[in-house]
Regions:
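A short alpha-helical cap/connector motif
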Residues: 1-198
Length: 198
């Protein structure tokens, strides 16, 4: 689906979160914290503003300590206190939770030829691996395998950078979710959002 708005999946998740009238005390978990400040791509700051408005908490998870430091800077800029910045692989963090309200997966990058050398070097340095589609698919599949039984009646799970069945981050995670009681609600802004079926 073409994305002519400049929005990403965090906007899609917000649109569906706001359908729930009882948001106070609920938690958004994002995997993939803010890196470069590019138009439409600062999901961390976007979620902080949403959480601040509705008395929610943000947990932002990233493998890169530099990205976690960016979370603290963003919180300071927005005067936002109700958050955690966790430096950990998304798969490892999601093993530790028992339930989730709202989950945003924008982790391991898929392959394209615009990645900076710095970003490629980070993957080699921290994860001892490279940016490939197969690695991205495996990471997102591993994450959904950790959480697919941890949703509740109103839980939402959003995967960003989903272009089609063969391109983007969700190529193996999405079929797994759909075979395990999760229903795709909408594909918009190059993202797909899911809820649990009864």
């Amino acid at each position: 689906m073409a994305n002519e708005t400049g929005y990403h999946g965090h906007k899609l998740l917000e649109e569906h979160i706001l359908k729930n009238p009882l948001l106070s005390g609920q938690v958004i978990i994002e995997v993939g914290s803010v890196r470069e400040h590019m138009d439409g791509q600062n999901s961390t700051g976007f979620f902080m503003e949403l959480c601040k408005k509705h008395n929610m908490k943000l947990i932002s998870v990233d493998m890169d300590p530099e990205c976690s430091a960016n979370v603290h800077k963003e919180a300071e800029k927005l005067d936002f206190k109700n958050y955690e910045a966790i430096t950990m692989k998304g798969e490892d963090y999601l093993k530790t939770i028992e339930k989730f309200d709202y989950l945003y997966l924008d982790g391991f990058d898929y392959y394209h030829n615009m990645h900076s050398q710095k970003r490629k070097d980070k993957y080699k340095e921290i994860l001892e691996t490279e940016i490939t589609n197969e690695n991205s698919w495996k990471s997102h599949l591993d994450m959904v395998k950790e959480v697919y039984k941890k949703g509740n009646d109103y839980s939402l799970l959003c995967i960003d950078d989903v272009f089609d069945a063969n391109k983007g981050k969700g190529c193996t995670a999405i079929p797994f979710l759909m075979n395990n009681r999760w229903k795709a609600l909408e594909h918009k802004y190059n993202a797909v959002i899911f809820s649990l079926t009864a």
